[in-house]
Swiss-Prot record:
This is Epoxide hydrolase 1. The lineage of its organism: Eukaryota, Metazoa, Chordata, Craniata, Vertebrata. It comes from Homo sapiens. Keywords: Aromatic hydrocarbons catabolism, Detoxification, Endoplasmic reticulum, Hydrolase, Lipid metabolism, Membrane, Methylation, Microsome, Transmembrane, Transmembrane helix. The chain crosses the membrane at residues 1-21. The keyword Transmembrane helix applies. Coiled coil: none annotated.
């Protein structure tokens, strides 16, 4: 009898696993209200309003006064960026910021693209919307939503946008011409922050889906890295029939399967689906994964637990804010940059570009609300939310940049995204792909579209 029960149980489990293993689940498309107070009975204003970035002499004067009060602490000898942002190099950065950086000029650059705001679920959502200046005969532009992460902003996409919207004038084929929409995550930059607890990536994905509908797009493509990769993933889980293609340059795919391959991959990598390049980027696993993630994730523990505490200090000090943000643009671009006195920052970025991104946090006072996004998404622990355990069933492309904080092998990506149709090992670049290597990322997005359209 017990043998029959055991065999029946095993058979039942096998049938359940076989039936459910490829079940294309979707997240429920709910509704929300994140503005202050209770939701009004009146219909929400769905108008789309032009917006312009502005500044003032008073704003700049206040910034300069605060910079002038910076209190310098000498770094330890030969510490480079191992202890965080090297304060000797910080002096150079703030001297440039105080005496040479032209915020009014950068505001003009920000306003080169059309900005808009619209109210969704009680929040004023900011976005830029860039249409192609010209189209080949018989072509229509492909709508592409691009989503930033932390501590970035919509400004990360300024150099890649013309490569996507006007490829012919930038030495590229006009086979794929895009209409690009770059929103600011609520609580970042010019998008209003939630007044209520619980505003996470799924809520953001739903709002951005509503934004695309409001702009008249029933079907569209989406692209993201960092938080943008999770938000875009959630969009594909919420409304897969509306997402024609998903392109990522980062993927949160840690699972029992990836853990197993990490533990056994150095010896049995080929049998576990790892390539020689995967093994090169992941091993020795103690240094390249475990020690590296421990060393670079301290900020995450703070922001997942008590974001308002550190945020209050950063929101009061522009120099502290710059050090906190720019240290990520050093190490996340290449972890080896921590061995350099200047963190390698100007090897990949200009100080004007870096400080413009910092100013988008400083002038809007959004560092605290941006950090709260960590607590809302990760504060309850890993793999505690439904979407983390769900697969994604839309055509997917992936760019694996070699200096991303954690390399993600194709086998891992395919486990989460079974319809992966394009996976590229990029020749250089790190976490801030669109900001650092716009040409490479644009080429891979176009490659993904070519593969998708051939199918």
């Amino acid at each position: 009898m017990w043998l029959e029960i055991l065999l029946t149980s095993v058979l039942g489990f096998a049938i359940y696993w076989f039936i459910s293993r490829d079940k294309e689940e979707t997240l429920p498309l709910e509704d929300g209200w994140w503005g202050p107070g209770t939701r009004s009975a009146a219909r929400e204003d769905d108008s789309i309003r032009p917006f312009k970035v502005e500044t003032s002499d008073e704003e700049i004067h206040d910034l300069h006064q605060r910079i002038d009060k910076f209190r310098f602490t000498p770094p330890l000898e030969d510490s480079c960026f191992h202890y965080g942002f090297n304060s000797n190099y910080l002096k150079k950065v703030i001297s440039y910021w105080r005496n040479e950086f032209d915020w009014k000029k950068q505001v003009e650059i920000l306003n080169r693209y059309p900005h808009f705001k619209t109210k969704i679920e009680g929040l004023d959502i900011h976005f830029i919307h860039v249409k192609p200046p010209q189209l080949p005969a018989g072509h229509t532009p492909k709508p592409l939503l691009m989503v930033h992460g932390w501590p970035g902003s919509f400004y990360e996409f300024y150099k890649i946008i013309p490569l996507l919207t006007d490829p012919k004038n930038h030495g590229l084929s006009d086979e794929h011409v895009f209409e690009v929409i770059c929103p600011s995550i609520p609580g970042y930059g010019f998008s209003e922050a939630s007044s209520k607890k619980g505003f996470n990536s799924v809520a953001t994905a739903r709002i951005f889906y509503k934004l695309m509908l409001r702009l008249g797009f029933q079907e569209f493509y989406i692209q993201g890295g960092d938080w943008g990769s999770l938000i875009c993933t959630n969009m594909a889980q919420l409304v897969p029939s509306h997402v024609k293609g998903l392109h990522l340059n980062m993927a949160l795919v840690l699972s029992n399967f990836s853990t197993l391959t990490l533990l056994l991959g150095q010896r049995f990598g080929r049998f576990l689906g790892l390539t020689e390049r995967d093994v090169e980027l992941l091993y020795p696993v103690k240094e390249k994964v475990f020690y590296s993630l421990m060393r670079e994730s301290g900020y995450m523990h703070i922001q997942c637990t008590k974001p308002d505490t550190v945020g209050s200090a950063l929101n009061d000090s522009p120099v502290g804010l710059a050090a906190y943000i720019l240290e990520k643009f050093s190490t996340w671009t290449n972890t080896e940059f921590r061995y350099l006195e200047d963190g390698g920052l100007e090897r990949k970025f200009s100080l004007d570009d870096l400080l413009t991104n910092v100013m988008l946090y400083w002038t809007t006072g959004t560092i605290i609300s941006s950090q709260r996004f960590y607590k809302e998404n990760l504060g309850q622990g890993w793999m505690t939310q439904k979407h983390e355990r769900m697969k994604v069933y839309v055509p997917t492309g992936f760019s694996a940049f070699p200096f991303e904080l954690l390399h993600t092998p194709e086998k891992w990506v395919r486990f989460k995204y079974p319809k992966l149709i394009s996976y590229s090992y990029m020749v250089r670049g790190g976490h801030f792909a669109a900001f650092e290597e716009p040409e490479l990322l644009a080429q891979d997005i176009r490659k993904f579209l070519s593969v998708l359209e051939r199918q």
